[in-house]
């Protein structure tokens, strides 16, 4: 089962779990929604901080809750089956900004650190029930979002000096980490 939806719209991430046996067993959720807007902390409008928190924490929380409800419902329905349900996997994309202080990144750093806290709580609560929860914290990935934040040449070159490899991550490099965490051997 594969789907895309607006992570901030509760109604779009609350699937009907009345008959899970009619659908494929849910096994993987990747929380990829992200938002960044750079500004000095003393002038960051409260609305910008809320947009960071809403997109980077609340959205993944809504999606993860919906996934867990669907997984647990399908798992219960599969109890009478001879084969055990596949393990559930939740992988959230955080950021190295959750681990390091970055200029003009106050709201972003806080939101990505919060996502790691959420992920740890999900791992603690849902791990014993069959769902692992992990986060990946890449450096800047050269996506549309990364280009928006770091597209200016002088800013980009200054930041690259602080990255040991001297380059931003490619989306496929981040994806490789996510794929590994979704494999059975990562349980």
Regions found by a protein language model. Name each.
Residues 95:
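Residue(s) in the substrate-gating loop at a strand-loop-helix junction
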Residues 41-42, 100-106, 128, 166:
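Active-site loop immediately N-terminal to the catalytic Tyr-X3-Lys motif
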Residues 64, 111, 119:
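Active-site helix of classical SDR
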Residues 167-187:
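C-terminal substrate-recognition "lid" of short-chain dehydrogenase/reductases
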Residues 26, 40-51, 159:
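Substrate-binding pocket helix/loop in short-chain dehydrogenase/reductase
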Residues 32-37:
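Conserved NAD(P)H cofactor-binding loop of Rossmann-fold oxidoreductase domains
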Residues 69, 124-125:
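Alpha-helical segment proximal to the catalytic Tyr-Lys
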């Amino acid at each position: 089962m594969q789907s895309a939806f607006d992570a901030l719209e509760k109604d779009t991430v609350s699937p009907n779990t009345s008959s899970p046996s009619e659908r494929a067993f849910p096994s993987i959720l990747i929380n990829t929604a992200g938002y960044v807007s750079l500004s000095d902390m003393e002038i960051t409008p409260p609305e910008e901080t809320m947009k960071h928190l809403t997109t980077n924490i609340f959205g993944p929380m809504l999606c993860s809750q919906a996934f867990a409800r669907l997984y647990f419902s399908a798992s219960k329905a599969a109890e009478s089956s001879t084969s055990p349900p596949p393990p559930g996997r939740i992988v959230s994309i955080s950021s190295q900004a959750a681990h390091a202080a970055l200029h003009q990144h106050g709201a972003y750093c806080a939101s990505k650190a919060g996502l790691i806290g959420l992920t740890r709580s999900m791992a603690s609560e849902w791990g014993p029930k069959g769902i692992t929860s992990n986060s990946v914290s890449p450096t800047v990935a050269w996506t549309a979002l990364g280009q928006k934040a770091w597209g200016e040449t002088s800013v980009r070159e200054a930041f690259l000096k602080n990255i040991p490899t001297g380059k931003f991550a490619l989306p496929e490099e981040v994806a490789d980490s996510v794929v590994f965490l979704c494999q059975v051997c990562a349980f």
